[in-house]
Amino acid sequence: MTSCIYNGTVIHKRFKPKIHFFKYRVFSLLIDLSELEKLDKTISFFSYNKFNLVSFFDKDHGDRDGSLLIDWVKKNLNQNNISSENIKIKLLCYPRIFGYVFNPLSVFYVYNNNNDLISILYEVKNTFGEQHTYVFKVKNENLLQHNCEKKFHVSPFIEMNCSYFFRILKPADKISVIIDQYQLNEKILYASQDGKRKDFTTSELIKSYLKHPLMTFKIIAAIHFEAFKLWTKGIKFIQKKLKIRNNISFEN
């Protein structure tokens, strides 16, 4: 199996209007979507679309209606004139722990049958239950950089008139996902996630859980705690204007 676990850190650094920094330890799963049934059968304490200590549910991603994520990815590739024949799809995300998860960012890596990356989908969620997916065609897998305009309200302390610059590594022994956010050509936020690879086995899953117990509950608590600290620093609260459910944009 090619699915694996990454243990690492998440870092956020805000530069404007005031400096704010935090760093948390996390673990993520990189799941080959074609292996989910096998993982469900072979990995203790992990389930697919069923409750367990650690689990993965289709309804947490894509159309969020429980439909197969492979079909959702293929549909969006076809709509963006990217071939969906003989592809492999891997998803980097947090799992559910005791049935709960919040994924601020999930990344779909799409490979052709030569194991070349041909597309990346950045699935962004906010705490209002909304989601926006940015779809990119990969033109050079040795230089995985993408930029686009911000199309989705995420933080109540950052305006919408911003742009994103994504820099990532092709998953291997390490992962790296970096997002720089700019406003009027000034960098206002740096966010990153890194990790070191571990095999997806029962023992490694338990080790990762014990290093980060109740991680997904801590993530949502940390989001609100850091927001409170921003508010105490006097940073302006920005009201969300639009209500959406699940938007997608094709960026190139």
Give, region by region, the residue ranges found by the protein language model.
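Mature, function-bearing regions of proteins
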Residues: M1-N252
